[in-house]
Amino acid sequence: MQGLILAGGRGSRLAADGVETPKPLVEVAGRPQIVNLIETFADLGCESITCMVREGITVDVPGPAVVRACRTPSSLHTLVAGLATVPPGPVFCAMVDTVMPPRDWHRLYAGVTERLAAGSVAVLAVTPFVDDELPLYVTRDAEGLATGIFDTPPRAPLLVTGGVYGLSPQARRLAAVAVASLHRMRAFLRLLVELRAPVATVEVPRIIDLDHKRDLDAAERWLTAPAGDEQ
């Protein structure tokens, strides 16, 4: 499994809240977020770790991680640019602003690995925890396969994507083609489901996206809370 971290965005909402530090470098639990993710990916067992970082941001990364500068108009474009540099094989991909405790990263990685090995074209991290300005809702069948991707809330139970994706070699090829006509990650995910490609889901209790200052504060409280006292 190859690892890919997407950090090509501007972080405009954090900046609007007065956070001047670029999103990959904001500190969560005492370390830059991108360093947290790199070390998480290494601990999970990713064979390689590629970080797509917005041009102009200097990142000092640990270990074997590779940083590629990019200036792209959307996360889908950043994904495709990253996939072009990642070694062959399945990919475990995360947005740089994705926060979870280690146990949930391990649970998610194991699920992604299992579902890709079983033949899924892609795997989505999903959570019932909805705290996003523009959530992407997912419906699924009894086997955990996605049946629909929606911008507005569907029938209960509500699940939303969490910024982590497992991508098979087939999904990598489809993304390279789709980017010519699609301009958002959610449009690509919706396309996969509409094509009736097997898109699996792995559920975790909570995922925080670092879009605003309040998200940074919530992530800090969550990850530094005493064991058994996380909220």
Q: Where in the sequence are the language-model features?
A:
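N-terminal glycine-rich phosphate-binding loop and ensuing alpha1 helix
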Residues: M1-T58, H106-G111
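Residues at the starts of beta-strands that form the adenosine-phosphate
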Residues: Q2, E47-I49, P90, V121-A122, ...
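Active-site glycine-centered loops adjacent to acidic/histidine catalytic or metal-binding residues
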Residues: G9, D97, H212
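Short, well-ordered beta-strand micro-motif
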Residues: E27, T85, T139, G166-S168, ...
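Well-ordered alpha-helical segments embedded in enzymatic catalytic cores
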Residues: Q33-N36, T78-A81, A187-F188
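Conserved beta-loop-beta/alpha segment of the NTase-like Rossmann-fold superfamily
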Residues: T58-A142
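Catalytic-core segments of class I nucleotidyltransferases/pyrophosphorylases
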Residues: F92, H106, L145-Q231
